[in-house]
Amino acid sequence: MVAPIKILGDRLRRALQAALPLDTYPQPLLVPASQVKFGDYQSNVCLSLAKQLGKAPRELAQEVVPHLEVEDLCQPVEIAGPGFLNFRLKPEFLAATLQAARGSDRLGIPPAREPRRVVVDFSSPNIAKEMHVGHLRSTIIGDCIARILEFQGHTVLRLNHVGDWGTQFGMLIAYLDEVYPDALTTANALDLGDLVTFYKKAKQRFDSDPEFQQKARAKVVALQQGEEQSRRAWQLLCEQSRREFQKIYDLLDIQLTERGESFYNPFLPAVIEDLAACGLLVEDQGAKVVFLEGFTNKEGQPQPLIIQKSDGGYNYATTDLAALRYRIDKDQADWIIYVTDVGQSTHFAQVFQVAQRAGWVPPHVTLTHVPFGLVLGEDGKRLKTRSGETIRLIDLLTEAIARSRADLEQRLATEGRTESPEFIDTVARAIGIGAVKYADLSQNRNSNYVFSYDKMLSLQGNTAPYLLYAYVRVQGLTRRGDIDWCTLSPDSPLLLEDETEQHLAKHLVQLEETLDLVSTELLPNRLCQYLFELSQLFNQFYDRCPILSAPQPTKQSRLTLAYLTAQTLKLGLSLLGIPVLDRI
């Protein structure tokens, strides 16, 4: 199955070439109609070309329409207003398209014609610190982008660029050496919560005790030089954090390949050497820097990006440049995506600029920063605990599951239903975690959003429970009607007689174009909105059109439409990282 918008776009392009031959045409040629009264798709290409060609848009439209060969897809194309072209898909085309999608796990969506090698850099917590609510968005958004690109046939390397190197390890090792030396030689000697507490105390000592500062810096040097005891201690600390991170990744069903900052240490000197060789690196106040184009300080002078500090140390920019080169040269990536908070936008713009000016980024390679806003509490401020502490991510997820369980148990009591503990555990976890993911992904990532358990767990509105319930309604048909989807005849026609059937069918065939839009804009909320509207359209169809009691062949047709809706919801939710449930 090829998306209708792609077929119509190709036909429109051919018609334009026949009627108005030009080297290029305005893009996009075609978009989904803004309102039902304008059809299913619209084009304003004639309006865009009017000035260039010196003709009225409507006159141009009248020249183009006779060359449009779309009789197999659409009703006669309508010229509307000053020169818009309106396209309405035929029910026969919709039925044939959906029938072709029925037998495919991919719902007829073909993989990309030109698959890319993509690196998605996301999550990236710091060792010896607990993951907090600030890591939620990067982890969920990055995973969703990776899932969609993988589905489209791209090769995706999901990288976790953990903060596993730096001065903080010298502080921590020096402090533990004094107060709890067993932690530096024995696995599992302390948990991550204790490690965080020790880290805070080590930081206080470092800031107030010059002698301790010297000891910490000596530990950093020992670590950098590969001294066995220091390196063993560092490995134990990293492993302890890694185990705790994995508990969260397992809960969220996140797959990642860890490649921390320390991995790139051997490549840092080459960054300095090569930037110097190409004439970009200069010395400024003892530091080695690259002066940036388009970035200025308060005095209006070019702003420097520090590559090597005056004491000879490296920083985040150095590591990110080394990582970028490695991903292009060794991983052979032709698209690198960084998913971080909006506060790092300037940093990545500067790193990308230096890499491009140094000639490290071939023309076929795309560098993309995917920024996102803050998670806010219901008071409109950054989400924190009542005592003002940053919320631990594990606590946030555990609370979501607990609230989901309480809602489920209350509903079971009201309905007089008895379910097994295993059922309650599975449903509570799926809805709780799914609600957290969907609440995040359904927002435009560029915006801040308000975190509310009550809203995200509601069965009403644009929420995960609402979508999961729509899927459950379809599965309920199989139980009440004793129906096996596998026995539905593949040759039975889709009738699409009722208006709600037609609206649902039109929406179902738009999945591919929705995924294309998401992978272009990297905005998962587009997919969420599609699935929400799909659930609404299905519920309208379900409430208006008898299914199990309908006569044949209407019953078979409507069951097929319900089945396709369920499969689309299942696929779409899986791309958001949310599993479906047969019962809730």
Swiss-Prot record:
It catalyses: tRNA(Arg) + L-arginine + ATP = L-arginyl-tRNA(Arg) + AMP + diphosphate. This is Arginine--tRNA ligase. Its EC number is 6.1.1.19. One of its GO terms (molecular function) is ATP binding. Signal peptide: none annotated. It is found in: Cytoplasm. Monomer. InterPro entries: aa-tRNA-synth_I_CS, Arg-tRNA-ligase, Arg-tRNA-synth_N, Arg-tRNA-synth_N_sf, ArgRS_core, DALR_anticod-bd, Rossmann-like_a/b/a_fold, tRNAsynth_Ia_anticodon-bd. Its main location: cytoplasm. One of its GO terms (cellular component) is cytoplasm. Keywords: Aminoacyl-tRNA synthetase, ATP-binding, Cytoplasm, Ligase, Nucleotide-binding, Protein biosynthesis. It is an enzyme of class 6 (ligase). It comes from the Bacteria. A motif ('HIGH' region) lies at residues 125-135. GO terms for biological process: arginyl-tRNA aminoacylation. Belongs to the class-I aminoacyl-tRNA synthetase family.
